[in-house]
Amino acid sequence: MPYKINRMKNSLEINETGGTLLVDERKRLRIGELYRYKFSVNKDVIKEQGLDVSHLFLRIKNEESALLRPLYLTGPYSFYIDVRPHNYNENRKFPGKEIIPFVENLKPDERFKVKILLNENSRVGDTSLYSWTIDIISQLAVTTIPKLEFSFRIGTTRKVVKKSNGLFKSIEGVSLEMWDTETLWDLPPKFPEKPVHLVIMTHGIFSNIGCDMLYMKDKIEEMTFPMDESINPNIIVRGFMGNVGKSGHGIHCLGVRVGKYVLETVDKLNKKYKVDRISFIGHSLGGPTQSMAVRYISIKRPDFFDAVKGVKPVNFITLASPFIGVIGDFPFYLSVPLDMGALGLTGRDLNLKYTPLTSKDGLYADDEVYPEHSKYILEILPQAPAKKVFESFKRRTIYANVMDDGIVPLRTAALLYLDWRSIHKVQKIRKKNKNSPTSSEFVSSDSPESSGASSPSNENGNNVGEIPAESPNKKATLQWTLPQAVIHGSKINKYKRGQTNEANSDSDNEQGVFLDGQKFEPPKEANTVLSALSVLTAAIPDQEYIKNPAVRKDEVIHDKLYHPEELPPPHYENRPIVKKLIYPNESVNRIQERIAREWQETMTWRKVLVQIQPDSHNNIVVRRRFVNLYGYVAVEHMVEHHFGSKVCSELAEDANEPKDEPNQSSQADRSNEYNEGEISKGAENAT
């Protein structure tokens, strides 16, 4: 990595039992904290000092008492650890039979022992230097009080790393660089004299910035740091760590804290650099939380997002975020505890319950008049004056799990409306063209990626994208898009209501805009309890999956740009009183419909649906590098299409254009801007 906090004194221990101790560390970590080490050995230099080795031994021990092992709900009192040779890269096949060592939960009084090899996988270029990166991450998820202690040793024999009491002396050729959480999340820009693009990340419930969002941060920096100066976005990634352990305080409170943090961070950075652009990335509850932060800023500092004098909004990205709440998707036995405060104010917010006598700071502008029904925090978020800010983002993107996410199901993560009809017809075309070349992703006709590439058309002349050739896993994934012999209409009514209109269509008939009478199998709904338990029980990627990208079957199955004119007419508006009395969920559905339409009636959204293995809610952000690697496809897509070289080239071109006062452009103009210049890998390969 290009930055380091400390270059530790290199040392050598001569041990009476035989062997040489090269590293002996002892540290403590709280919730949301980690240490990253880069251990390097110059083989030629240490050979001159009598150390001729082809491998070394690493030992990490959780020094906490074994009595803490059963206390999982208040902990867990464990560490996640991985050891990556210098040449390991998720994008490339890792050669040979060497394993990538990691442990998902190093429990109290347990030891993690690894034999690290000085070979081509760890060799730095053509030099005699060999290097490894070691991440040691606290797994604490709830309480902020404990500090977990670990010991970390590297030596030339197993005995010396197990127990060593010898004499140290300095040695050349061995180095250990160390980064703590604060330093990793406070890296400076590559070009201090150039304008800075600030990326703000926001975590979800029982989560944290320092550890859980680290993989996405790493990937954004790995993508942008090597870019040529002419197009380099000069990224700085930051995240507010003050909400750790406070998930129940409510969306308003959490968002206000993030909003204040953003203002303070920008003001602080502007003393050294010039913050020119800003992007937001939120996971799970982080989506509504960052939305509240944007609202707070738009009210407290109306000029903050000014296109000329302020910071330009670029990306607004959410991954598995409950925009319209979860009350319609959670079973009754879980909804009641949320109403009663099982997750504090946050649970009530997500269950669309109003809590009086709470702060209204940053919710309303003094000169605004709001509808009487706008009392739910999730409904207030996209309203004026924040709406103008959300509309001004260059890109607004939603990532949602199609299946296996009972925490934030597809319906709320995708803002209610999807083009089910297009997905169904694409599947039919895929079956007819089994022998045609296929792409690695599904790309819809309206995807920002599809410009400049041809794609097949259906019988109505509407362009559709392609889905990859079928495999057993993909068949299970997409079985819900296939025509079925028998299915009851009542089971798919909510999908009919969520079906978007075709572009330039005047149809307002629900049945007509859905599947033209064809039978439809909706996606299987995940069980909320099982989804929560999957954090503990979900399968972990094997070594073949970790080392070989070709075997990974998790994929993007839908990627489309949704325009406001595609929204169907509101279903729950002006309904007869009798229906309001008959249907128990009428009120909830009406509120959720209002929220979804408020977000989409004036804004274009890119909706990306991914199919990844359980536990998909954590996998979608790769919460832990190897445990949650199934979500690699989502993170890769997000980074490539929002921070990739082509996108950065466009931003660089925009920055070089004359900066005149912006006129009042239409939403259609903003939508066209969103489409410009993005080409997906799937579209490039389409035939």
UniProtKB/Swiss-Prot annotation:
Residues 670-681 have a biased composition (Basic and acidic residues). GO terms for biological process: lipid catabolic process; lipid metabolic process. Residues 436-463 have a biased composition (Low complexity). GO terms for molecular function: monoacylglycerol lipase activity. GO terms for cellular component: cytoplasm. The active site is at S284 (charge relay system). It comes from the Eukaryota. PROSITE patterns: LIPASE_SER. Pfam families: DUF676. The keyword Cell membrane does not apply. Keywords: Cytoplasm, Hydrolase, Lipid degradation, Lipid metabolism. It is found in: Cytoplasm. Residues 429-472, 491-513, 650-687 are annotated as: Disordered. The keyword Lipid metabolism applies. It is an enzyme of class 3 (hydrolase). PANTHER family: LIPASE ROG1-RELATED-RELATED, LIPASE YDR444W-RELATED. Present with 2070 molecules/cell in log phase SD medium. This is Putative lipase YDR444W. It comes from Saccharomyces cerevisiae (strain ATCC 204508 / S288c) (Baker's yeast).
